[in-house]
C-alpha cells in the first residue's frame, strides 16, 4: 500500500526520484498516465491490469465513456526506474501535470500520484478546508 508525501526536485532531463518506500512495490516497470486534478497517476503493472479491465468494461456506446477511455489510455506510458531509482517522465505527461522543478510524490493506497509543488499546495489548501465535510460524505460509501 502506498502512503506518504515526499518532495523531490526533477532534473533538467525530466527525471524524478521515486521514494525508496515505493520502488519495490511499483516494480522495475510501471504505468504512468494522466490523473485527475492535473496530477499523474502511477500504477504498478498488477494494479494497471485491474484498472484496465474495469475501464475496458465501460460502454463504448456512451460518449463520456469513450472520451474517458481515449484520454486515459492515450496519455499512458510504460516507464521504468533506472539504477538510481529515477524515472524519466515523458514530455507530454510533464506538460499535462505542469511539472517544472519541484514535485511532490504522494502515496494514495493502490497508486502513486506525482504533482507539481504549486498545484499540490493549492489542492491541499482547498481540500483541507473542506476535509471534515468530505469525510462525512465518504462515510456513506464505507457503510
Swiss-Prot record:
Highest classification ranks of the organism: Bacteria, Bacillati, Bacillota, Clostridia, Thermoanaerobacterales
Primary location recorded for the protein, binned into one broad class: cytoplasm
Residue ranges of every copy of the SpoVT-AbrB domain listed in the record: 5-47, 76-119
A molecular-function term among this protein's GO annotations: transcription cis-regulatory region binding
The keyword Transcription is annotated on this UniProt entry: yes
NCBIfam families named in the record: division/cell wall cluster transcriptional repressor MraZ
Name of the protein described by the UniProt record: Transcriptional regulator MraZ
Classification via HAMAP family: MraZ
Amino acid at each position: 500500500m502506498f502512503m506518504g508525501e515526499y518532495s523531490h526536485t526533477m532534473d533538467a532531463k525530466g527525471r524524478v526520484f521515486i521514494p525508496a518506500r515505493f520502488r519495490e512495490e511499483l516494480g522495475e516497470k510501471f504505468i504512468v498516465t494522466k490523473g485527475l486534478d492535473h496530477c499523474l497517476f502511477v500504477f504498478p503493472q498488477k494494479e494497471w491490469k485491474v484498472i484496465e479491465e474495469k475501464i475496458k468494461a465501460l460502454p463504448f456506446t456512451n460518449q463520456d465513456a469513450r472520451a474517458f477511455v481515449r484520454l486515459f489510455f492515450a496519455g499512458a506510458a510504460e516507464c521504468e526506474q533506472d539504477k538510481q531509482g529515477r524515472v524519466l517522465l515523458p514530455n507530454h505527461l510533464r506538460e499535462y501535470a505542469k511539472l517544472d522543478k519541484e514535485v511532490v510524490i504522494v502515496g494514495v493506497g493502490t497508486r502513486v500520484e506525482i504533482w507539481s509543488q504549486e498545484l499540490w499546495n493549492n489542492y491541499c489548501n482547498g481540500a483541507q478546508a473542506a476535509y471534515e465535510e468530505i469525510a462525512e460524505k465518504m462515510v456513506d460509501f464505507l457503510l
